Amino acid sequence: MLWVDDEIHHLKPHILFLESKGYRVSTATNGNDADVLNKNNRYDLILLDQTMPGIDGMETLQKIKIQRISIPVIMITKSEDEWLMDEAISQQVNQFLIKPVSPNQIYIACKQILEKNKIIEDRTTSDYLKDFQKINDDLDNIISTDDWWDLYIRLVQWQLKFDEYGDSGLSNILGEQIQSCNKSFSNFIENNYEGLTQKTNDSLLSPGIFQNYLLPLINNNQKVCIIVIDCRRCDQFLSVLPYLESLFNIELSYHISLLPSATPYSRNAIFSGLYPDELIEKYPNQKELFMNHADGLNKYEHKFLLDQLDRHDVSNKRVHYHKIWAIEEGKKFRKKINDYLEKDVLALVVNFVDMLAHDSSKMDVLKEIVPDESGYRLTVKSWIKNSWFNDVIKILSQSDFHVVITSDHGSIRVNKDIMVSADRDASSGVRYKYGRNLNTNNKNAFVINQPERYKLPVLGPQFNYLIAKNDAYFLYPNDANRYKNKLQNSFQHGGISMEELLVPVLVMKGY
């Protein structure tokens, strides 16, 4: 490190103390000498006085930053002037210490800057190894969806810590632990999903979103904006939570996506408040769309929302629904948002994350950008903070709206191909299929031969569903190799996994 102070000779005890702790300390008595030393050496840290002959500390700092903009700096000075503190903060000085300071104070400040990441990385490693066994023990005692949510949040928090501080090679262990948990989760869903669909009040599944989170606010004459970001995973929500908390008070909860964990089922359920079998009974055209595997299965969400408002006797509310599937459409929404703020209920559907998941299996460039879960998190986080969406969120935080952000389902990176026996009329999904007499190994799939028990549409005789479990995906034997090369290691949805089914709900109000 380099210590710059015109009275450096008075600081010899401090320098000796730092050297006894293993630091090498160079010194300078003025800013010009410090500038020369900085050009000729690569220091890890600068200790800097403000009041010196010639150029002062802030001028010296500007010269130093020209050479290395990211070098950390501790300012140690007698001055308590607030303007100097403000200037130091604006110049991204890491710490500001006021003389006199003890050797130990300076050592602690240096250690916090130079060794912080290493200390946190080591502690993260040891803490995870302790929690590893506790997670495995807790896995044996799970009896409810709340237990699963709590466990999954712990796993996601470890993923985020490894993203930030390094994983010391533990990412693979965490990945294997998540796979193990997913196997147990799949068994839990197979055994309990039918019961979850029978709950009429406070349903945790997709049809309960409106009644649980929006209706209480609407009945209290509060303005509400629901934002459904298609295919956004829990880890992607939590990675931007600190940023959102700078704008909103946030209550974090969850819901469970319907099976199959796909947009035609779960997102329609959010806006209609209906299960898929109820939906096709109330809206017969939906049945035709399903039977023909047609596009546009979600094009009536606006009508579904209005009908749901009517069923709950709040149809007098002014409503605006908007679906955004392209950047330009998002920019248009941003330009007109002040008009939409006159409404009582805003509904916004955003397809960016879903398109990213689908396109990453088709484009080599996206495969490079989103090679794994960490890359996926980083890409979504960057989009949140740098797109039109960020402007919209900031405007909403300053409005009188309560904002409910959620997703219809998540996604999972698939790695295990399994063969399916089906006729040519079966649906084309990678993680789920429906049709006549579908068959596969039930070790890696939930085979639903009585769809009506799970509130799924029965679209013909001998009709059944296959729902992939864990990280499996479906292939037909005649095209297996071609599609395996395309789908292996891609992000898909429609099946059973914590990543797909356990979906955060953020209820937010600006400060």
Identify the role of each PLM range.
Residues 7, 50-51:
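The short loop immediately C-terminal to the conserved phospho-acceptor aspartate in CheY-like receiver
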Residues 8-26:
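Two-component/phosphorelay signaling modules centered on CheY-like receiver
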Residues 16-17, 51, 86, 95, ...:
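Feature captures the catalytic ectodomains and active-site-proximal regions of enzymes
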Residues 29-33, 56-59:
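Acidic catalytic/metal-coordinating carboxylates
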Residues 36, 58-69:
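Short amphipathic alpha-helix used as the core "switch/output" element in two-component signaling
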Residues 41-47:
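Active-site beta3 strand of CheY-like receiver
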Residues 49, 77:
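Active-site residues of response regulator receiver
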Residues 59, 80-95:
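Alpha4 helix (beta4-alpha4-beta5 surface) of REC/receiver domains from two-component response regulators
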